[in-house]
Amino acid sequence: PVKDRVEDLLKRMTLEEKVGQMNQFVGVEHIKANSAVMTEEELKNNTANAFYPGFTEKDIEKWTEEGLIGSFLHVLTIEEANYLQSLAMKSRLQIPIIFGIDAIHGNANAPDNTVYPTNINLACSFDTLMAYKIARQTAKEMRAMNMHWTFNPNVEVARDARWGRVGETYGEDPYLVTLLGVQSVKGYQGDLNGNEDVLACIKHFVGGSEPINGTNGSPTDLSERTLREVFFPPFEAGVKAGAMSLMTAHNELNGIPCHS
C-alpha cells in the first residue's frame, strides 16, 4: 500500500534526501534552450529565464541520480521525462520524480496538445460542466506526456483590470470563481487512482489579484472582511473538494510576505 511505502521511505531517508524532495528545477532541455540565447552577464546573474547561476544541467542530472530533486517543471517531451525518471531510479531509494507544468487552458506549453480558451473566457460561459470536461481532458493529455501535476486552477478573484494575470482567473465574482474552481479540481484529479488523473494546485494564496499598483507581485493591502468575503471562499472550497496542493502568492499581504 502507498501509505506503508511512504512511511517506510520517511524512516529510511536522510535529512538531505527529505530536503531534496522539496527541490523543484526546470528540465535540462529548458535550461539549454535558454542559456543558448543569453548573454554572459545574464548567464551569471539571471534566474528569471530558468538558469541557475553557478550550476549546469550536469549538476541537475547528478542531483537527480542522488535523490536530491523531487520534481521538475518545463519538461515538455516524453523523451526528457523518461530520461530524468531513469536517473531518479538510480538513486538510493528510487523515489520517482513528479513532473509539473502550467497547464492553465489545456496542456498548451507542450507540443501537440489541445489548447482551450483561457479561464476568463470559460468564466464567460458560466458552464461548470465544461470546466470539468476541459480539466478531465487536459489531465488525460498530461498523463500521456508523463506529466503528473498542473499548477491550476487559478482561483484568485479578479479585482484590478491592470493586473496582468486576469486572463488566468475565472473573473470577478467569488461565487462563480468557486464553482468553476471546484469543478476544475474534480476534473483534473478524478479519483486519483488511474493513469488519467493529475494533481491539481489551487493558487495563489492570497490576495495577489489586488496589488496596490496593478503590477503582479506588488504588495497588497486588504481588510480582513475583504479577505473573508472575497478571497478565501474559492480556496476553502478547493481544499474541501480535495485539491492536493496549494500555491502561495508572490506578494506580501498587509506587510507580511505570503511566502519566503
State what each model feature region is.
Residues P1-S260:
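Glycoside hydrolase catalytic-domain context in secreted enzymes
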